[in-house]
UniProtKB/Swiss-Prot annotation:
It comes from the Eukaryota. Gene3D superfamilies: Preprotein translocase SecE subunit. Residues 1-39 are cytoplasmic. This is Probable protein transport protein Sec61 subunit gamma. The keyword Ribonucleoprotein does not apply. Necessary for protein translocation in the endoplasmic reticulum. The lineage of its organism: Eukaryota, Fungi, Dikarya, Ascomycota, Pezizomycotina. One of its GO terms (molecular function) is protein transmembrane transporter activity.
């Protein structure tokens, strides 16, 4: 019985230990790296927004033609 409880308690301890080791190895991005990542994310947002706009721009008239304005 005590072995089962010990096994149950070992899982969170190992998880916490691994998490602490991971955080200690991580480092914050420097200013240049942060700007580069921000530009990449911003470009992705713009491209996805443009694609969504174009799809909607084509879909609305096409839907009107197919449905017939019902």
């Amino acid at each position: 019985m005590a072995d089962q409880i010990q096994e149950i308690l070992d899982v969170p301890r190992e998880f916490l230990k691994d998490g602490i080791q991971f955080i200690k190895k991580c480092q914050k991005p420097d200013r240049r790296e942060f700007i580069k990542i921000s530009q990449a994310v911003g470009t992705g947002f713009l491209i996805m927004g443009a694609v969504g706009y174009l799809v909607k721009l084509i879909h609305i008239p096409l839907n009107q033609v197919l449905v017939g304005g019902a």
